[in-house]
Amino acid sequence: MRHFLFSLALMFTAALCAADRPNMIFIIADDVSWDDLGCYGNTAARTPNLDKLAAHGRRFDEAYLTASSCSPSRSSIITGRYPHNNGRASELHQPIAAHIPWFPRLLREAGYYTALVGKHHMTSDQSAEGEKPQPEPFDLVDPGNEPGNKGGHATWVKTLHERPKDKPFFFWFASLDAHRDWDGDKDWQEGLYGPKHDPATVRVPPFLTDDAATRQDLASYYNEITRLDYFVGKVVAELEKQGALENTLIIMMADNGRAFPRAKTRLHDSGMKTPFITHWPAGIQQPGTPSQSLISAIDVAPTLLELAGVPVAPTMQGVSFAPVFTHPNAEVRKHAFSEHNWHDYSAHGRSVRSEGFLYIRNNRPKEPWQGPADSVRSPSYEQLKVLRDEGKLTPAQADVFLAPRPPEELYRSDADADQLTNLASDPNYASVKVRLAKLLDDWTEQTGDSAPADISRDMFDRETGESLYKRKDNSYRGTPPGWDRDASHVNAPGPR
């Protein structure tokens, strides 16, 4: 009966006038950390178009991902579910369970024209046990590339221009910037994007080495972000040209942090905190006022469905943050949970953010947390290895090689932005650690999470980043988390 009523509500919503519902453009960057945009305080990275959206919209300062890993993060966003609740999709390059709806499909069934342009990196599992396969969520799927631009954004404006004019639209615009190996930097067009970033001006995080090779690596990364920003500006200009900007909600975020050591795949803010910029002239009150409201990536799906007048699917574990568009600091959740599963290397870690603290539980503490293979192969990682071999690493820089790791980590986010001082053993914070550990235990139990005994093994060498297996050899794959508890059929959201 519940699913019948849900379907009936979708049919009713589809009959609504297009003018009553906002258009939506969801822009997702690839491997971009929250503090690498100008509007978040980075004075070196050039992001004028994103900065303008933030200045006239709503910038979220406490937005967190559920996974700092490409496809698990994207799968979580599109389903509104935690990675371990998406079936095998909790691990990199794995599909979402077939019975779980994607929110663009619900928008499409409710009358929206939907398109995905750029990087996809999400698949629906083959149906099993008599389940029907996932219906197509997009009217259009386009890789978004053209000669001289393989960044996924070359046809964003074309998609806007050629859309049906009698329907509201939802576009998932997925840039490949700023994923290694710096395609945008190699195909740089100064006439469009301006001069390349000067390595002397980049901000070097304390967990990297401050040398010429690392600075050049960061400058190339900044160039990727600036290229993305250019195409965001082209999208906004096309919306203005069409007279559609006023009632179009634009959201920009990233799938995970920068592909550098101690960022991408980390549960720390360098990996899990995302830039989150919204712009919607018709719907945002007090534009330009940033928000300190805590939100999670799983909140995107229920928010967009609510704004479109579409019933939120019962499978979705997130909560709508629509009230923040009216009241900048409206409280929509108290806690944000994240997880780290297999991404090139064997892994199982969990975290919760609450009360201004970050609590991390390392369930495989004997292994180092060096980052994904592309980061291990980077010039920045090579420079860390040089200092390691010379015995010259600072404690912050040595963190990527640390083994065993502490089983628990606790950080006070307001006083330790880079999260370098672990308070887990500090008696002054013992009660905080107990509370957050209990929250994580409750979330684990209620959402059906687990740590499998036959966990997926390393696919790459941890020192060199080179593959340990031949192509299409998946023998390293083990059991995903939550598999033994049938977590893909668990809809409980856990503490919020």
Residue ranges and their predicted role:
Residues T13-A14:
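N-terminal signal peptide c-region/cleavage motif recognized by signal peptidases
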Residues S413:
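Structural signature of FAD isoalloxazine-binding scaffolds in flavoprotein oxidoreductases
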Residues C70-S71, D458-D461:
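Acidic helix-start/capping segments at beta-turn-to-alpha-helix junctions
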Residues R2, F6, C17-E409, A417-D442, ...:
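Formylglycine-dependent sulfatase
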Residues E445-G448:
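Short arginine-rich
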Residues S450-M459:
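Short, flexible loop/turn segments with low-complexity composition
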